[in-house]
Each structure stands twice: as structure tokens, then as C-alpha cells.
């Protein structure tokens, strides 16, 4: 299957200057602390309109009062843009489109030179967002985890009516994008689960033929160690029952529609720990996570862990937080104390970490034969 959008890999190799700075620093914290993240995930709000059965951040609590104020975010964006942050994904522990000033935030993000993306359930995607923010957005990935209203409602723990609402919202977005010749990629992502495995082909047809989206991603579940839910903790992607439709999904591809069935990532879920990296070199260097209550973290899979929290944008500027003493201690902790065998398997930075570990530890065979 085609991976036109690089979904089942990483793009750090296209940032050689940043990679060179990491290699040249040689674990010198005084040098590493000067490297700003390439990518930041921002949670505009803590509230969410769904309670997905696989949600990794259920332990945060979906706090409706947690919200980044627009004026604070504008200041943070100027700081990030002037210090080399290149991209922001609005997602997080809540549903980003619920934020009432999200369109103003998106416009400001693009204004300061930062690329914009969204991961959303798209229930709250309205005409105002489509007409104002699509033009500033590089891509939108919609979490849609059922091929029927019944299974969708079961997995998302919402009303069945939301299934058709999301389809209609996406159709509007694609039509507006095409009519106005906007450069915004629109795709759908599903977590492969026992409840929806038999419906993935049907969902793929809806995405391709009814919605007209650009791609469909089918990815494995990954247990977040801190999550309250343990429903899929023992899921086994070596099962042919779960993966029976892989070839039929591949057959859905066309020139304008791509399917990314993340079989490699599924295999990694059951990989021998001895083959994994033993140091997380991407954290807290190349990405940051901004919680809805304002805290800045170096890793999205260690939220509420003080070893990964460096400060709060409601109390200090982003630069003050990122170059502060708490992050300095955080870098030292990751390099010297973090046991990655206890981290989430297939985390957001997994492919980046594999790449960096091979570079740092010299694990690439015949590297000079380019």
C-alpha cells in the first residue's frame, strides 16, 4: 500500500540541521537545551464530546474548565514562531474544535510561520471553521472508528447520529477545499479493534466514494501505561481474524485515494524489547506538548509526570519554560534514568527514536555505502 503522506514513517531526515545539532551536542545538556522543538502538539481545551473506549488520556479527566485563553495562545505562538517551531497539531486531551476562538488561533499560527494540522473527531466541524481555517491548514486527520452508526457509537461512546454528522461535515470540507483549490489534505484514521475490524472495508468505501477524502489510515491500538481503560490491553495483532481485510483494503486505492494499513507498526507492537532503542533521544528535544491547562511537557505519553513537566505558559513565556531549569533536569532524566521499556509501545516519536538511536549508536550496517 502507498504511504504517500509518510504516515507510517518519520520525516526527521528532512531536517538535517536539527539532527546535526543533536549529534554534535553529544549529550551535553547545555547545548541540547538550546534546541527548540520542530513539532508541538497543542490541546486547546480539556473537554471532549466523546469518550472513546481506546482513549489514551482518559486519566487526565476531560476537565471542561481547562482551556488555553486565546490571548495567551497568541503570545505563545509569536514566541514559538520566532524560535523556529515549524509545526503544530491541534489535538490533545480534548476535542480542539470545541475551542470558541480556534479560527483566530489557526490564523495566528499560520501568520507567524508555523504549519497547522488537526486531529479531531469532526463532530464540531462547522461552516465557520471550514470557510476560515481550511485555507491555513496543512492537513486534517479525523478519528472515525466504525463503519456503521452502531459500531461508531459503541467505540466513541456517543449517539449514533454523530456518525452521519461526521460524514456530512467531511463532505462539506472536501467540497469547499476542492471548489476553492486549497492545499489541505483531508484524511480519516481508525484504530483497528475487535468491534470494527469487519467494517474497515465498508468504512474505506464510504471515505473514498461518499466523502472523497485523500486517505484512510488503519492503525493498531497502543496501551498508554497511565490510562484507566484496559479494554484492549491484551489485543494481539498477529491474529488473522483482526487483519483478514488487509488485501481488500489495499484494493480500494486509486490515484486520488490512498490506504495506509500500518502493518509494520502492528508488528512492532509485539516486537522483542531487545531490538528496541534503549534511549529516547527525541525527548525533550524535537517535540513538545502543551496541555489545555497551560503546562508544557516534553512527551505526550508522560502527562502529569513531573519529570516531563517544565513549566506553565500562564506563568512564564514559552521560551522561559523551554530553556528553564526544569527542562534541563528533564533532559538529564531522559538521558540517564528513563527506562524506555516501560514507555508506551509505538509512541508518537517511536520511528524518530529508532532513527536517532541507530545514528547515535552506530547501528546502521555499511552506512557509508550511500
Annotated model-derived regions:
Residues 48, 94, 122, 190-192:
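Short, flexible loop/turn elements at secondary-structure junctions
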Residues 51, 84-85, 136, 211-212, ...:
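Short loop/turn motifs at secondary-structure junctions
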Amino acid at each position: 500500500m502507498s504511504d504517500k503522506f509518510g504516515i507510517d514513517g518519520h520525516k526527521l531526515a528532512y531536517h538535517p540541521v536539527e539532527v546535526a545539532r543533536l549529534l554534535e551536542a553529544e549529550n551535553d545538556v547545555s547545548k541540547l537545551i538550546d534546541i527548540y522543538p520542530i513539532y508541538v502538539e497543542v490541546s486547546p481545551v480539556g473537554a471532549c464530546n466523546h469518550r472513546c473506549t481506546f482513549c489514551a488520556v482518559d486519566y487526565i479527566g476531560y476537565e471542561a474548565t481547562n482551556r488555553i485563553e486565546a490571548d495567551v495562545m497568541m503570545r505563545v505562538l509569536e514566541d514559538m514562531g520566532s524560535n523556529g517551531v515549524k509545526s503544530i497539531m491541534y489535538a490533545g486531551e480534548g476535542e480542539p474544535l470545541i475551542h470558541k476562538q480556534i479560527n483566530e488561533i489557526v490564523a495566528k499560527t499560520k501568520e507567524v510561520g508555523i504549519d497547522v494540522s488537526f486531529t479531531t473527531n469532526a463532530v464540531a466541524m462547522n461552516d465557520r471553521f471550514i470557510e476560515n481555517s481550511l485555507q491555513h491548514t496543512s492537513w486534517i486527520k479525523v478519528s472515525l472508528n466504525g463503519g456503521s452508526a452502531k459500531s461508531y457509537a459503541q467505540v466513541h461512546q456517543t449517539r449514533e447520529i454523530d456518525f452521519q454528522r461526521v460524514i456530512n461535515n467531511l463532505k462539506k470540507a472536501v467540497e469547499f477545499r476542492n471548489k476553492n483549490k486549497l492545499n489541505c489534505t483531508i484524511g480519516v484514521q481508525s484504530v483497528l479493534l475487535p468491534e470494527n475490524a469487519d467494517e474497515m472495508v465498508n468504512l474505506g468505501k464510504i471515505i473514498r466514494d461518499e466523502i472523497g477524502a485523500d486517505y484512510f489510515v488503519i492503525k493498531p491500538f497502543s496501551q498508554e501505561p497511565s490510562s484507566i481503560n484496559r479494554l484492549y490491553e491484551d489485543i494481539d495483532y498477529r491474529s488473522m481474524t483482526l487483519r483478514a481485510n488487509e488485501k481488500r483494503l489495499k484494493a480500494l486505492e486509486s490515484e486520488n485515494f490512498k490506504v495506509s494499513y500500518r502493518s509494520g507498526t502492528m508488528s512492532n507492537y509485539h516486537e522483542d524489547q531487545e531490538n528496541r532503542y534503549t534511549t529516547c533521544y527525541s525527548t525533550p528535544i524535537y517535540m513538545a506538548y502543551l496541555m489545555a491547562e497551560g503546562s508544557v511537557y516534553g512527551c505526550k505519553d508522560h502527562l502529569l509526570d513531573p519529570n516531563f513537566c517544565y513549566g506553565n505558559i500562564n506563568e512564564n513565556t514559552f521560551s522561559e519554560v523551554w530553556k528553564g531549569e526544569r527542562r534541563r533536569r528533564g533532559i538529564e532524566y531522559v538521558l540517564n534514568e528513563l527506562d524506555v521499556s516501560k514507555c508506551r509501545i509505538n509512541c508518537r516519536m517511536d520511528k524518530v527514536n529508532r532513527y536517532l538511536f541507530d545514528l547515535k549508536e552506530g547501528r546502521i550496517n555499511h552506512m557509508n555505502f550511500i
